Amino acid sequence: MARRSTKTPPPDDSYEEKILDIDVVDEMQGSFLEYAYSVIYSRALPDARDGLKPVHRRIVYQMNEMGLRPDRGYVKCARVVGEVMGKLHPHGDASIYDALVRLAQPFSMRLPLVDGHGNFGSLGNDDPPAAMRYTECRMADATSLMTESIDEDTVDFTPNYDGQEQEPDVLPAAYPNLLVNGSSGIAVGMATNMPPHNLGEVIAAARHLIRYPGADLDTLMKYVPGPDLPTGGRIVGLTGIRDAYESGRGTFKIRATVSVEDVTARRKGLVVTELPFTVGPEKVISKIKDLVNAKKLQGIADVKDLTDRSHGLRLVIEIKNGFVPEAVLEQLYKLTPMEESFGINNVALVDGQPLTLGLKELLEVYLDHRFNVVRRRSEFRRSKKRDRLHLVEGLLVALLDIDEVIRLIRSSDNSAQAKERLIEHFSLSEIQTQYILDTPLRRLTRFDRIELESERDRLNGEIDELTGILDSDAELRKLVSGELAAVAKKFGTDRRTVLLESAGTPAATVSLQVADDPCRVLLSSTGLLARTANGDPFGEAEDAKRTKHDLIVSAVPATARGEIGAVTSSGRLLRLSVIDLPQLPETASAPNLSGGAPIAEFLSSLEPDEAVICLTTLDESSPGLAIGTKQGVVKRVVPDYPSNKEELEVITLKDGDRIVGAVELRTGEEDLVFITDDAQLLRYQASQVRPQGRAAGGMTGIKLTEGAKVISFTAVDPAVDAVVFTVAGSRGTLDDSVQTTAKLTPFDQYPRKGRATGGVRCQRFLKGEDCLSLAWAGALPARASQKNGTPAELPEIDPRRDGSGVSLAKTVSVVAGPV
């Protein structure tokens, strides 16, 4: 195949070559200035009057032109984007849609201008918005205020990019949108970054400035104390805010809103419900994990994002035991986006020029714009009403002699002649005459003179009112102030962002961890274990006996980083670390242990048939521990607990014997009390029992009859009001759910006896009763409960030492006194 020949075409002599020499410096300066001005004026900076950039203004205006009112249905965002791009903003659909999405995001705008339907993204852009073909939108309720009266010659219009459409230079803006919603943008050689504010506060400041034009900044800041961010949070330090309100530039810090809560039965956690402006939870979680992995952040066990649409933001940061949550929080503020700085730079366009404005200047520019809008609106309305009044007056003249009007019209050869004759005969203007001629005869004859006169009077009144506004600056300012007040009443909301003068006293560093503060460790009747927030004694609230799990059977003083012992029924003492125990909230009444954790979680070595009898301190200066067994053995343990052992024997038990009671002596002057199942009670002073070492087996505490056993052992302070509670039953049905009678007797009714004696009778058995199924002795007030922690009532006090009992309304399984 032959190659195709390629010939160079001859030069075209019809074009004359012309080369211009241009200085590159001049060309770069000129082109760059044009580009910079285009970016500043047409893209990046908002207008100080309506607070909108061109793309936002075009979106709002075009939605208004499309009739997408708040009471209409939603339309696809793609349709709105197409209309805006085709008619007003030829810069690509992506940039327009991004701008539209921002106007619909409640976490970006303090008062959203677009009502979005669908996925419009999430805080921090962790979840991007859906494509425009899936989402829908319409104007928000407040958006109608931005375009209100735009068709009444309130603002100037200019041709669009191709000259086929008209677009407004600015929107009427019935509220100070720039301050309310803020703005951000990067231009050439300058940028703007303005935080949102509370609508009600901004309007209050604007109204004050209307009334007192010479108001100073301090006065205005009484109304606008600081930004009010859509995402809430806490602004720390107000000095930077005042600088920004004075000069247009300043910096402040935003902190997340965090509370310390019990996130599990054994651990505290930081619950984040509000994050700094523009910060999303994924960003915070990612940063925390990076810091933990790099070992730059200590004390965090886990981070969970429990955010949902129903409950809003909820970020749970679980704190390890032994770390101060407040101290960990300080580190989070320092190292993560949970604290961010916001640099205010109030740059906006004023008369086409970028200026840096303070709070007062921003309000003044807006108010000047609003005065101009209302003035032009009033002139437009007055003109329209004057035109209508002119027509009404013509109709009234015609109605005075309607028959003559009809005769003149019918007798005329054409409309021009009729027009001339009506003008000549009735002294009407051409406009009035033309309106009469254009009105069908059937309508002309139906006009009611009274209605027309009423309309004339109403129009005259409205014209006078509008003239008064236009002629009086005071009336104009009063009208604008009233309209602003109506906007605030309808759309105003409570402040979301808390303003703090300072961050307060910094928490201790994490390295210090939990301070070794005093506390109390509590054991409930249902086996729940917890520690209090401090070592103060708690009150004896009556409602405690109605609260489940509040029956405390053992309590010991401790410190947050200390240890205590748990005495078991098999004679062992097991060490417990106090820091691992769940901490109860501070309360002035009796504590509720529903926030505690089962003691078995902390004592993994407990046998299935082994129970914790009491808690004890490991302080060697205490009087020691008193122990009583089922076989009647008593022992006072010398407080000598080696710190290198997690498990100790506090008594050597005989075969078949078990501890039924153990109590830490407070003074050593208490009375020890044994109660047996055959209703014998023995009381004697603790001083009759010689303290013994841990390995000793104790001594005889009570002389038991054949077949009897001890069911209760305790120590009672003889100086306090105390009682003895006993419940009778039958040996054939020892289940405490089958109880017959019970008795509550003052403790002082039982005399002291010697150690190892048989004691005295504490309850007389009735028919069918042959043993005690439950017994307890202790100080008042005494409270009772069932096995599951449900409160139960005790009988009235019976002063008889050996009297019989009375029936119970509810089964009693546990009794306890104050601790």
Regions found by a protein language model. Give the residues of each.
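Catalytic phosphate-handling regions of large nucleic-acid enzymes and associated NTPases
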Residues: 1-248, 310, 314-316, 549
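C-terminal interaction appendages of subunits in large macromolecular complexes
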Residues: 2-6, 15-17, 24, 183-184, ...
